[in-house]
C-alpha cells in the first residue's frame, strides 16, 4: 500500500475516515507525538526548522524592499515626507474599471497602487537609505541571507552536522552566545550603523561603501575614546531648528542624552538612540560573559538556582530542582520565551507611539494607528500561547518527585487560592466598572448628565506629574520647579524631556480624566479575566477536584462522558480556547480606547472623547457608529473611491466572523447527519456519482470544530477592525 498522509503516524494513516486528514494537519507540528521520534531527533528537527523560519522572514523583508524599490515612490517621498503618500506596491487587477483605476491611482503613481501604512518608509529614511538603489541593495542582501539560512537548515539535518542533545542542553553556552553574540554584538553593530551612516545622512552627508573609510563620523575621530574624554562626543548636538536630512542647523555630536523629540520630525533624537544602543550593547556584552562554560569561571545556573532558598524555610525548598525541570522541558522553555516576547511586543506597541523612533512617523496618523493595533494583537496571541505551552508542560513534562516542595510544587499546592483571588478581582472589576458605565448611561438617557458618577484618576495623574507633567497642578518631583530633580533635569540629563512631556503635539503622558479612568478599569477587567482562565487552565491541566486524572487524557480532550458530573469544557485546551475570546475582547477595548482618544487629539476636538467616553452609548454612537460612516461610504451614488476596498473588507470581515458561530454554536451530531445526507444525495445523483472518495466523510471532532470556529472568529474580528481603523483614520487625515 502506498504511504498515505500523515507519514509521521501509521495509526492515523490507516484511519478510513476524513479524520485522517484533519488530525494529520493538527498534529503535523507536534513532533513529540510522531512515530519513531527520539529526544535527539526532536531537538534536531526543531533546530533545523528555525533556519527555515529565518529564511521565510528574510525573504518576506526582502520582498518589502524590492517591491517599494520597483513600484513605490521612495525617492519622491524622501523629498517631502509629510505630503507625499508612501506607496507599498502596485495593484494589478483585471477587474478594475475606469472608476477603480482613478480611485486607486495616487501618490504620484501612473496606475493603481496600495498606500503603505507600515512605517517602512519612515524607518528606511531614518536609518540613512535615500535612493531606490539603496532599497534594491538591501533586498538583494536579505535574499542572500535567506539562501544562507536555507542552506544552514539543510546542513544541520545531515548526519555529520547534526548537533547532539548535550549541545542543545548546554544552557550556559547558549546564554552566553545569545546575550553577547546576538544581543550584544548586534546592538553594537547597530550603534555603528547609526553613527557611521544614519546620523551623517540626517545631516545631509551620504556615507556608502565607496567613502565609508574616508568620512569621520565625529570631527575628533577616536581620540576622545582613547583619552577618556567621552563627553566630547555629546558636545554640539543638532539644534532645535535642524532640518532633518540637511546640514542646516546640524551639529557634530554622535552620542547624546538630550531627551524629548526632534522638533521637525517629532521623533527621538538619532544621537540619543545611538547612545541607547551603545549602552545596551555594553550591558549585554558583559552579561554574556557571566556564565561558566569551558573555562571554569563564572556562574553555573544550576548552582544559582539551588542557592535560592528563602530564609526561615517558610517557602519550602525554593528553586531546587528547577534547573533540570526547565532544561529538560521544551514546553517550559517555549512558555517562558513566549511570555517574554508577548510582553515585549505589547511594550513595542506602547513605545512606538509614545516615543516614536522614526522621522515623521508621528505625523502619519494612519500608520501610527495601524502599528499600535498590529502589535497589540500579536502580543495577545503570543501571550495566550505562553500559557498553552505552560499547560502542556504540566501534562507532559512535569515530574512531582523532582520538584518536591519547591516554588513550582508550592504554586500547584495553593492553586485554589491563586484562582479564587483572580476570580474575586475579575468579579470586582467587572461589576463595578459595568455598574458605573450603566449608571452613567441611564443618567444620559433621562436627560440628567450632571448626575453621572465621574471619578478623576488622581493617582495616575500624580504619577504623570512626578514625571514632569505640570497641567494637573501637583507640585511633586519633576513637576516641582523648586526641587533638585527638576533643576538637574534642566541641565545634566535629558533637558528635552520636560518640554516634550508638557507639549500637546505628541502622545507622551496624555491628559487623562474620568473617561480614561473607566476604560482603564474595563481593560483591567479584561486582562484579569483572560489571566484567570489561562492560569486556571495551566494549574488544573493535570487534574482538578472534579477530575483528578486529567493528565492521562492529554492536553485537548473534549469530555470524559457523563460521569463525575459531566466533564466537558475542562481540558487545558478548552481554557486556552475560551481565553482567546477574552484576549480578543480585551484588545478590542484597548485599541478602541487608543484610537478614539487619538482621533480626537489629532482633530483637535478632544472634548468629544472626554464627554462621550463616560457611558456605553457614547462609545457605540460617537466612536463606532460615527467613524464607520467612511466605511459605509466606499460606494455611493457618485461612484466609488479609494475607501471602497476597506468597505468591502469591513463587510467581508463581518462575514468571516459570523461564520465562526456556525462552528461554535452547534452539535457534532447535527454535522454528521448533514454530511450523511449530502453523501447520500451525491451517491444517487447521475454523473456526480462517478466521483468517489476514499475516506468516509465524518464531522469534525468537538475540539476541531471549536478550533475552526475560533479561527474564523479571530480572523474576521481582526479583518473587520483593521478595515474600520484604516478607513476611518485615512478618510479623515489622508
From Swiss-Prot:
Give residues annotated as binding chlorophyll a B1: 654
Report the sequence similarity comment from the record: Belongs to the PsaA/PsaB family.
State the superkingdom.
Eukaryota
Give the location in the cell. Answer: Plastid, Chloroplast thylakoid membrane
- Where does the secretion signal sit in this chain? none
Lineage in the entry?
A: Eukaryota, Viridiplantae, Streptophyta, Embryophyta, Tracheophyta
| The gene coding this protein | psaB
Chief site of localization: plastid
Classification via NCBIfam families: psaB
The free-text function statement in the UniProt record for this protein reads:
PsaA and PsaB bind P700, the primary electron donor of photosystem I (PSI), as well as the electron acceptors A0, A1 and FX. PSI is a plastocyanin-ferredoxin oxidoreductase, converting photonic excitation into a charge separation, which transfers an electron from the donor P700 chlorophyll pair to the spectroscopically characterized acceptors A0, A1, FX, FA and FB in turn. Oxidized P700 is reduced on the lumenal side of the thylakoid membrane by plastocyanin.
- Supply the SUPFAM superfamilies for this chain: Photosystem I subunits PsaA/PsaB
The GO molecular function terms of this record are: 4 iron, 4 sulfur cluster binding; chlorophyll binding; electron transfer activity; magnesium ion binding; oxidoreductase activity
EC number(s): the record gives 1.97.1.12
**Protein name, UniProt field:** Photosystem I P700 chlorophyll a apoprotein A2
- A Pfam family this chain is assigned to: PsaA_PsaB
- Enumerate the residues binding [4Fe-4S] cluster: 559, 568
Q: Which GO terms describe its biological process?
A: photosynthesis
**Reaction(s) the record says it catalyses:** reduced [plastocyanin] + hnu + oxidized [2Fe-2S]-[ferredoxin] = oxidized [plastocyanin] + reduced [2Fe-2S]-[ferredoxin]
Quaternary data? The PsaA/B heterodimer binds the P700 chlorophyll special pair and subsequent electron acceptors. PSI consists of a core antenna complex that captures photons, and an electron transfer chain that converts photonic excitation into a charge separation. The eukaryotic PSI reaction center is composed of at least 11 subunits.
Q: Name one GO cellular component term.
A: photosystem I
Transmembrane annotation, as ranges = 46-69, 135-158, 175-199, 273-291, 330-353, 369-395, 417-439, 517-535, 575-596, 643-665, 707-727
Xref: PANTHER family = OUTER MEMBRANE PROTEIN, OMPA-RELATED, PHOTOSYSTEM I P700 CHLOROPHYLL A APOPROTEIN A1-RELATED
Q: What InterPro entries does the annotation carry?
A: PSI_PsaA/B (IPR001280), PSI_PsaA/B_CS (IPR020586), PSI_PsaA/B_sf (IPR036408), PSI_PsaB (IPR006244)
**Keyword Thylakoid in record:** yes
Q: Which organism is it from?
A: Cucumis sativus
Amino acid at each position: 500500500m502506498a504511504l498515505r498522509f500523515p507519514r509521521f503516524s501509521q495509526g492515523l494513516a490507516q484511519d478510513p475516515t476524513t479524520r485522517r486528514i484533519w488530525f494529520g494537519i493538527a498534529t503535523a507540528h507536534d513532533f513529540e507525538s510522531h512515530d519513531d521520534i527520539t529526544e535527539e531527533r526532536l531537538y534536531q528537527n526543531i533546530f533545523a526548522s528555525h533556519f527555515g523560519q529565518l529564511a521565510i522572514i528574510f525573504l518576506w523583508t526582502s520582498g518589502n524592499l524590492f517591491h517599494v524599490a520597483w513600484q513605490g515612490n521612495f525617492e519622491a517621498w524622501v523629498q517631502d515626507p509629510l505630503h507625499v503618500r508612501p506607496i507599498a506596491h502596485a495593484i494589478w487587477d483585471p477587474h478594475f474599471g475606469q472608476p477603480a483605476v482613478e480611485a486607486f491611482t495616487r501618490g504620484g503613481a501612473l496606475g493603481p497602487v496600495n498606500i503603505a501604512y507600515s512605517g517602512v518608509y519612515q524607518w528606511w529614511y531614518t536609518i540613512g537609505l535615500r535612493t531606490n538603489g539603496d532599497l534594491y541593495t538591501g533586498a538583494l542582501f536579505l535574499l542572500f541571507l535567506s539562501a544562507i539560512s536555507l542552506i544552514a537548515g539543510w546542513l544541520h539535518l545531515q548526519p555529520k552536522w547534526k548537533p547532539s542533545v548535550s549541545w542543545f542542553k548546554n544552557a550556559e553556552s547558549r546564554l552566553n552566545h545569545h546575550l553577547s553574540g546576538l544581543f550584544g554584538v548586534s546592538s553594537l553593530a547597530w550603534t555603528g550603523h547609526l553613527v557611521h551612516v544614519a546620523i551623517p545622512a540626517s545631516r545631509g552627508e551620504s556615507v556608502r561603501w565607496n567613502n565609508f573609510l574616508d568620512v569621520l563620523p565625529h570631527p575628533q575621530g577616536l581620540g576622545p575614546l582613547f583619552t577618556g574624554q567621552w563627553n566630547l562626543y555629546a558636545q554640539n548636538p543638532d539644534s532645535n531648528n535642524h532640518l532633518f536630512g540637511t546640514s542646516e542647523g546640524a551639529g557634530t555630536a554622535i552620542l547624546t542624552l538630550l531627551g524629548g523629540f526632534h522638533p521637525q520630525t517629532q521623533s527621538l533624537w538619532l544621537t540619543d538612540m545611538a547612545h541607547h544602543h551603545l549602552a545596551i550593547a555594553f550591558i549585554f556584552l558583559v552579561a554574556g560573559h557571566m556564565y561558566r562554560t569551558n573555562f571554569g569561571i563564572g556562574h553555573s545556573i544550576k548552582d544559582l538556582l539551588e542557592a535560592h532558598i528563602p530564609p526561615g524555610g517558610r517557602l519550602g525548598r525554593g528553586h531546587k530542582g528547577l534547573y533540570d525541570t526547565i532544561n529538560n522541558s521544551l514546553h517550559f522553555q517555549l512558555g517562558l520565551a513566549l511570555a517574554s516576547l508577548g510582553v515585549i511586543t505589547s511594550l513595542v506597541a506602547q513605545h512606538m507611539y509614545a516615543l516614536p523612533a522614526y522621522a515623521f512617523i508621528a505625523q502619519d496618523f494612519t500608520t501610527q494607528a495601524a502599528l499600535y493595533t498590529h502589535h497589540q494583537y500579536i502580543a495577545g496571541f503570543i501571550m495566550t500561547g505562553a500559557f498553552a505551552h505552560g499547560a502542556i508542560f504540566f501534562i507532559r513534562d512535569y515530574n512531582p518527585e523532582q520538584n518536591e516542595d519547591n516554588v513550582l510544587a508550592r504554586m500547584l499546592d495553593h492553586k485554589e487560592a491563586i484562582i479564587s483571588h483572580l476570580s474575586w478581582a475579575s468579579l470586582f472589576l467587572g461589576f463595578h466598572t459595568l455598574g458605573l458605565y450603566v449608571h452613567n448611561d441611564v443618567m444620559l438617557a433621562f436627560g440628567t448628565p450632571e448626575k453621572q458618577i465621574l471619578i478623576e484618576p488622581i493617582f495616575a495623574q500624580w504619577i504623570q506629574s512626578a514625571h514632569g507633567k505640570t497641567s494637573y497642578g501637583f507640585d511633586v518631583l519633576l513637576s516641582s520647579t523648586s526641587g533638585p530633580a527638576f533643576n538637574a533635569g534642566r541641565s545634566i540629563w535629558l533637558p528635552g524631556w520636560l518640554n516634550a512631556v508638557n507639549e500637546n503635539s505628541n502622545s507622551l503622558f496624555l491628559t487623562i480624566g474620568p473617561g480614561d479612568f473607566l476604560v482603564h478599569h474595563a481593560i483591567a477587567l479584561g486582562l484579569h479575566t483572560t489571566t484567570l482562565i489561562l492560569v486556571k487552565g495551566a494549574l488544573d491541566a493535570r487534574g482538578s477536584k472534579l477530575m483528578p486524572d486529567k493528565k492521562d487524557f492529554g492536553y485537548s480532550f473534549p469530555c470524559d462522558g457523563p460521569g463525575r458530573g459531566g466533564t466537558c469544557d475542562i481540558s487545558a485546551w478548552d481554557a486556552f480556547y475560551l481565553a482567546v475570546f477574552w484576549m480578543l475582547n480585551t484588545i478590542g477595548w484597548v485599541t478602541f480606547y487608543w484610537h478614539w482618544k487619538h482621533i480626537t487629539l489629532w482633530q483637535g476636538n478632544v472634548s468629544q472623547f472626554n464627554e462621550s467616553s463616560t457611558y456605553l452609548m457614547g462609545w457605540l454612537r460617537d466612536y463606532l457608529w460615527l467613524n464607520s460612516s467612511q466605511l459605509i461610504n466606499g460606494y455611493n451614488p457618485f461612484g466609488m473611491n479609494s475607501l471602497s476596498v476597506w468597505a468591502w473588507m469591513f463587510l467581508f470581515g463581518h462575514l468571516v466572523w459570523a461564520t465562526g458561530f456556525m462552528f461554535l454554536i452547534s452539535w457534532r451530531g447535527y454535522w454528521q447527519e448533514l454530511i450523511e445526507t449530502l453523501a447520500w444525495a451525491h451517491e444517487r445523483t447521475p454523473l456526480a456519482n462517478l466521483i468517489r472518495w476514499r475516506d468516509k466523510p465524518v464531522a469534525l471532532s468537538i475540539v476541531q470544530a471549536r478550533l475552526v470556529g475560533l479561527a474564523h472568529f479571530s480572523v474576521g474580528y481582526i479583518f473587520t477592525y483593521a478595515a474600520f481603523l484604516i478607513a476611518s483614520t485615512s478618510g479623515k487625515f489622508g
